[in-house]
Amino acid sequence: MKITNFLALGICLLFGSCTMQKSTVQVNDKGTEWEWNKGTIVVKTPERPAGQESVIGLALPKMEVVRVGFVGLGMRGPGAVSRFTYIPGTQIVALCDYEKERAEKCQKYLKEASLPKAAVYSGEKGYEELCKRDDIDLVYIATDWLHHFPVAKCALENGKNVAIEVPSAMNLKECWELVDLSEKNRKHCMILENCCYDWFEMNTLNMAQHGVFGEVIRAQGAYIHNLAPFWKHYWKKGEDDKLGWRLDYNMRHRGDVYATHGLGPVAQALNIHRGDRMETLVAMDTKSVVGKDLVKENADSVCNSFRNGDHTTTLIRTANGKVIEIQHNVMTPQPYNRLYQLTGTKGFANKYPTQGYALDAEQLKASGVQPKVDDLNSHGFMPREELVALVEKYQHPILKKYGEMAKEVGGHGGMDFIMDSRLVYCLQNGLPLDMDVYDLAEWCCLAELGELSMDNGCAAVTFPDFTRGEWNKIQGYKHAYATQEEEANSMEKAKTFTKKLKEKNRNKLR
């Protein structure tokens, strides 16, 4: 009997029938094709349609004035409208929300800035009429998650540039459609990832780009934010909607559904699709406890299935052998935390929960800062005096330009204003945007890829290549800048336009 069992096991191992998954192509509920290959889930990268070209480094003709239409004026949209009234050379042409009164309410920001009223659109499909206008250059989307894609698709199909709040796409199908629409129409499709513009992240990115940490080989990011005070405030579609759109989405979907705050800044530091690419991930989550309780509390019914775990962890390995860890937790009580940690061969940076840098004396000197203590080492964070000197030396040029005004205008401490200002700056100067459609797709696809991993025993899953082989075309992530002369010229035109627009509106109201 033992001999028979051993023979059977040997045959199984020889032919792989006991351990190998079927290699037939499978399709999940979102339409994604995938198959097993040596224990790894391989996700198909579709071929680029004929006549379509990459938009890496896409630069469009300069826009003296950026004419904007805003769609989605609930929690985040009004703040964006307000911020744009502070940016010279912009014109808020149209406002749109499902609920008309929300759009009308945002007229107050224009009035306070002495700017003319904007056209108002509302209803389920109001954004379609906005996108058809021929006097809009940019559609700024801040709706609930499920409307990000349809609004962006409509805008791109109507020849508009788009900027989309996070997460900008909810699955791979949407990611690929946005990539193809951007490439086909030669228009910008930017993810509005504000955390890439926070002070620590920008200064640390500048340090990394100047070799302060040596080669960055590992990075961490997260979105850990107990949303208990906010669940009741998310938009609800009618009286029958007891959960609100965000809790409902978490209930129905597994994976890191809000990865971009953590992933975006570290992806820039690791030069993703600028010399490296994310290749493989493995995801794991805890069971849902708080999520189920929230459904029971808000819907007054027992929740038997809550797909999103209370805490999700995703591990990613890149083509160049770097590792990224991303976490998501909006359920349990703990301090706000985006982690943001870079581990380099010669130094270390960490934002949450303790902010600081760790370098030894030799590396600090090599980075252009003279240590004040003789025995400085990397076993702990550097003293405050050295920290201040290091940050001062490597203060990011974008922070020097916009930092002080950003603190006055606000928006998550000012980073939202910096993000919007850079978007307008690049459009006015005909430059590539700081984040392109490939960033959008790479950062947003973690949700579905993580779901694939966890639904298949936490298996390894390959990333599709949204650049379709061009991830190594550019070496190193960089922000684009105009020359001083070009910058001064575009700013003069912007200020002149805004001044005349306000004067015309004041005269009209007299």
Regions found by a protein language model. Name each.
Residues 22-42, 46-50, 55-56, 78-79, ...:
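C-terminal helical cap and adjacent loop that interface with cofactors, partners, or active-site loops
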Residues 138, 144-145, 149-197, 211:
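Beta-strand-loop-alpha-helix segment that lines the small-molecule cofactor/substrate pocket
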Residues 326-337:
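Glycine-rich phosphate/pyrophosphate-binding beta-alpha loops
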Residues 118-137:
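A structured beta-alpha segment of the ubiquitous adenosine-cofactor-binding alpha/beta core
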Residues 8-16:
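Bacterial N-terminal signal peptides
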